[in-house]
From Swiss-Prot:
This is NADH-ubiquinone oxidoreductase chain 4L. It comes from the Eukaryota. The chain crosses the membrane at residues 1-21, 29-49, 61-81. Its main location: mitochondrion. Core subunit of the mitochondrial membrane respiratory chain NADH dehydrogenase (Complex I) which catalyzes electron transfer from NADH through the respiratory chain, using ubiquinone as an electron acceptor. Part of the enzyme membrane arm which is embedded in the lipid bilayer and involved in proton translocation. The keyword Transmembrane helix applies. It is a multi-pass membrane protein. One of its GO terms (biological process) is ATP synthesis coupled electron transport. Its EC number is 7.1.1.2. One of its GO terms (cellular component) is respiratory chain complex I. It comes from Orycteropus afer.
């Protein structure tokens, strides 16, 4: 396995570990989730370029679109929670149910 793939997988693993450690704060969870999506984007792009697989070149762009939608929803949820409660704890999300 080339070292670039090892570095990307290590970045994904570190983001996953950060997501598990900082799961009580919404902002930290969103940042770790964005790190995971970015490492998956880079991994998909490098694999598509190295394998010369033309059908796979659209996959990283679709992943980037979903990551942007996830970031927009996450940031709007963060703003709503912080305006309502003043804190960004994930446990406050249960209180927002109708």
């Amino acid at each position: 396995m080339p070292p670039i793939y090892m570095n990307i997988i290590l970045a994904f693993t570190l983001s996953l570990m950060g997501m598990l450690v900082y799961r009580s704060h919404l902002m930290s969870s969103l940042l770790c989730l964005e790190g995971m999506m970015l490492s998956l984007f880079i991994l998909g792009t490098t694999m598509a370029l190295n394998m010369h697989f033309t059908l796979m070149t659209m996959l990283p762009i679709v992943l980037l679109v979903f990551a942007a939608c996830e970031a927009a929803v996450g940031l709007s949820l963060l703003v709503m929670v912080s305006n309502t409660y003043g804190l960004d704890y994930v446990q406050n999300l249960n209180l927002l149910q109708c």
